[in-house]
Regions:
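Glycine-rich FAD pyrophosphate-binding loop
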Residues: 25-45
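Helical element adjacent to the flavin cofactor pocket in flavoenzyme catalytic cores
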Residues: 140-198
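C-terminal catalytic lobe of FAD-dependent flavoproteins
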Residues: 298-387
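Short beta-strand to alpha-helix junction loop
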Residues: 64-67, 92-100, 139-158, 285-292
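Active-site substrate-recognition segment that forms the wall
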Residues: 22-26, 82-86, 194, 199, ...
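Dinucleotide-binding Rossmann-like beta1-alpha1 core, especially the glycine-rich loop
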Residues: 50-126, 135-136, 256-257
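Beta1/beta-strand and adjacent pyrophosphate-binding region of the FAD-binding site
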Residues: 2-16, 32
Length: 387
């Protein structure tokens, strides 16, 4: 087995890993990025045409970070000369008397993001394709939209190579068998290489706990199911007419649904955000249950009836990696300044990934944000997080 040494190793070439590689390469840092599957694969959490981006968060800490997250994507677009953000507008709605809408509106106000708060009846007049219960609480954010997910990951990998030249190396289809932390430097072991590195960033998603089994917080990988509907009349669901949406239930109806317009030839994406039973990420299961499809159709019948009977012409699965509190994990390993872990994202991290790549580069190089104070990252993202 060959032994090599390098300065920066990143494990995992999804949203977080590609962003970290891009940001490090822009700074002139050598980067070795290792991915167990082919680049652009659909086995993890970063594939698919699009993801929602929005300032609309009920948690004020995430809402405060979203302007910086939007700015990070703008910087990527300027560097690449291509767009990844698609402005569609976004609507968040919830039952009357539930504090979700009030929290979202208050947080948008606090960060200075334009928005309108209204009743379900008001919203149905604005966009008649919806049939939201009249008393529901609705918040509309004009600047919410979508991120071209697969394109964004590919662009960051391309730019990492452009900025880094020969100093950027990408190793696809290369599983990491173990990480040795017994010596003075982290050592990454593949089937053919032993790699000693000055700094190791682990952005391996659902495989993080396999590579770092002694993490002090339990992480759970769950399989998510996504549906794409093909309505007979697509016009009301096109970008410019149909916004991204978030529905948050309350009481006995604690369901959390989301959706977005068709993009790059896909149908209308609708799914339930749900932390289900734990799954083994190495066991590939692409089935989507009929019962799940009926749950989603039931939601549509009550809120977007014109879509409820549309055929499903595509299904996808992906993985969430979830912490018990559903926050992110971005931190140094305890007692190590040379090993950084950046996962899970608990099902809502893609919109932050370009920003987190910048933070990871700061942490790895001792840059201006390496203490993370300047970006006000959450104490809840640390391994030793508040209970």
């Amino acid at each position: 087995m060959q032994s090599i040494a390098t300065r920066n190793v990143i494990i995992g070439a999804g949203a977080m890993g590609s962003a970290a590689a891009y940001r490090l390469a822009r700074r002139g840092e050598p980067v070795l990025l290792i991915e167990q599957f082919p680049l652009g694969h659909d086995r993890g959490s970063s594939h698919g045409a699009a993801r929602i981006t929005r300032h609309s968060y009920a948690d004020p800490s995430y809402a405060r970070l979203m302007p910086a997250a939007f700015q990070a994507w703008k910087e990527l677009e300027a560097d690449a000369g291509q767009s990844v953000y698609i402005r569609t507008g976004g609507v968040s709605f919830s039952p009357a008397g539930f504090d979700y809408g009030a929290c979202v509106a208050a947080n948008l106000e606090s960060v200075g993001v334009p928005h309108r708060r209204m009743t379900g009846a008001d919203w149905n007049r604005v966009n008649p394709i919806f049939s939201v219960p009249a008393t529901h609480d609705v918040v509309f954010e004009p600047d919410a939209g979508m991120l071209a997910a697969a394109r964004a990951v590919a662009l960051q990998l391309e730019l990492a190579r452009t900025h880094g030249g020969e100093k950027t190396q990408v190793m696809p289809s290369t599983p990491v068998r173990r990480i040795d932390l017994d010596g003075t430097r982290p050592v990454v072991v593949t089937d053919s290489l032993t790699i000693a590195t000055d700094r190791l960033i682990v952005t391996a998603g659902a495989w993080v706990k396999h590579l770092l089994p002694r993490l002090p917080i339990p992480l759970v990988a769950t399989r998510q199911q996504v549906l794409y509907f093909r309505p007979s009349d697509p016009a009301p669901f096109r970008i410019g007419r149909f916004p991204v949406f978030i529905f948050k239930g309350s009481g006995e109806d604690e369901a959390f649904f989301y959706g977005m317009p068709g993009f790059l030839g896909t149908g209308i994406k609708v799914a339930r955000h749900f932390v289900g039973p734990e799954t083994d990420p190495d066991v590939e299961d692409r089935t989507v249950a009929d019962a799940y499809c009926e749950i989603v159709r039931g939601f549509l019948r009550n809120h977007i009836p014109a879509l409820a009977g549309a055929p499903i012409d595509l299904t996808e699965t992906c993985l969430y990696t979830v912490a018990p509190d559903e926050h992110f994990l971005v931190d140094f390993l305890p007692g190590r300044s040379d090993v950084i872990v950046a996962s899970p994202c608990s099902g809502h991290g893609f919109k932050f990934s370009c920003l987190i790549g910048q933070v990871l580069a700061d942490m790895a190089t001792g840059g201006p944000g390496h203490e993370r104070g300047e970006l006000d990252l959450l104490p809840a993202w640390k391994l030793a997080r508040p209970s």
